Amino acid sequence: MKSFSAKITSIKKNWYCIDATNKILGRLASQVSIFLRGKNKPEFTPHIDVGDYIIIINASKIVVTGNKEKNKFYYHHSGYVGGIKKYTFKYMMLHHPTRIIKKAIKGMLPKGSLGQKIFKKLKVFPFNQHNLISQKPVFLNI
């Protein structure tokens, strides 16, 4: 029996919406990365993008466990000498709540061109409203 390999033309991609209210960051990110990658589907093929589109709403209401709110840091470097910036989780939640979820999920996806293509299917919104209603997303309870 030959191994199954999915064809790009035969793949149907669905839209899912996830509410991040009171969800733990890492647990949500790992579940979302599985749906983005398509590992929940029986026709999963590692070298083809078979995953679905994911919309995450209420990103500003995500939580972390333990002391990570004070002790977790996000780093950014401008490329110049001494140009490193260090932000706490609390600061990022106030100013850029969508970047926290995007960064967590991006680290769980493949590195390379396929990972970049998969990452573009993730849409994150800080509050309850989003502009993708025309896609008719199905709500997922994770």
Curated annotation (Swiss-Prot):
How does it associate, per the subunit comment? Part of the 50S ribosomal subunit.
- UniProt keyword annotation of Ribonucleoprotein present: yes
By its UniProt entry, which InterPro entries does this protein fall under? Ribosomal_uL13 (IPR005822), Ribosomal_uL13_bac-type (IPR005823), Ribosomal_uL13_sf (IPR036899)
Q: Where does the source fall among the domains of life?
A: Bacteria
| Species in which this protein is naturally found | Buchnera aphidicola subsp. Cinara cedri (strain Cc)
A Gene Ontology biological process annotation? translation
Report the protein name in the record.
Large ribosomal subunit protein uL13
Q: Which GO terms describe its cellular component?
A: cytosolic large ribosomal subunit
